[in-house]
Amino acid sequence: GEDRYLLAWTTTPWTLPANTALAVNGDLEYSEVKVDGERYILASELVEKVLQDEKHQPLKYEVVGKLNGNDLVGLSYEPLFMDRGENAHKVWSADYVSAEDGTGIVHLAPVYGEEDYALAREKNFPAVHTIDENGFFTEGDWKGSNVWEVNKQIAKDLKERGIVWKIDYIRHSYPHCHRCGTKLMYRAHPSWFMDIDGQREEMLEQNTEVINWFPSHVKHGRFEKNILAAPDWNLSRDRFWATAMPVWEGTDENGEKQQIIVGS
C-alpha cells in the first residue's frame, strides 16, 4: 500500500533526536488526507488549520478516511534518527493530547518533558538522553554542539531529508531563569526524593502538637496547607543559591562513616 505519514508537531526541535514515541488522544477523531499525492494523518478538527502553505494559504486536499484515536495506538513508525530498540517508535494514547494546537499527534522525548516521562514509565518505552547536563549534544551529527545553537538547524536538516512537512514560526512563552535570564532546559536526571506521602500524617501531627508558630495562624494556615498539598521532595538540588541541606557526612577517628543532620 501507499506510505502514510503521522503528522506530529513540536515547538522544540532540539528534542527530536531523543524521540522514542508519538502520542494521540484515543477519544479524538483523526482524518487521513491526501495532499499532492501524499497521505497524512492528523486530528480532524485541525485539518483546515494545519493544511496551509508557508504563506498560510489553504492547500487543496482530499479526505480519504476517518479514524478514531485508538485505531492509531500500537502502530509503529520509522525513527527520525537512531532506532531506540524494543518498544520504541510506537503510537500511544495520552489524555493530555488535545486538538487545541498542533496536529493532535504529539512527539515524545521522555527525558525532556514531565508528561512524556510519566507516559514512558507507564508504557515502558525507552527514555534516552542525547544532551548532557550542560546543554551539549552527546551523539549524532550535532555531538559537542550547544542545544540552542543547532535548534533551527535540526529542523532544517530534517526538512532537507523530506521528513519535516512544514516549518512555521510562532511566538510562545518559554521558561527562563529569573536570575540570569538564560533559557531553561527541562532534563530528567537521577535524583533522591523524600517520600512525603509516607510521612504526611506524622508531619501534620508534629506541626500541630510540637511546633509553636509565630504568628500562630501559620500553623493551621499556610504551613499546614503546604504539607497537605506537598509532592515528594526532591533532595538532589543542583541550584547554587538558597539554603543548603544541613546534612554533614564524614569519617570518625575509628574510620567509621558518620552522618549528622542538623536540626533547627
Residue ranges and their predicted role:
Residues 1-17, 71-74, 87, 96, ...:
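Residue patterns forming the tRNA-binding/recognition surfaces of aminoacyl-tRNA synthetases
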Residues 17, 21, 28-105, 114:
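Protease-associated
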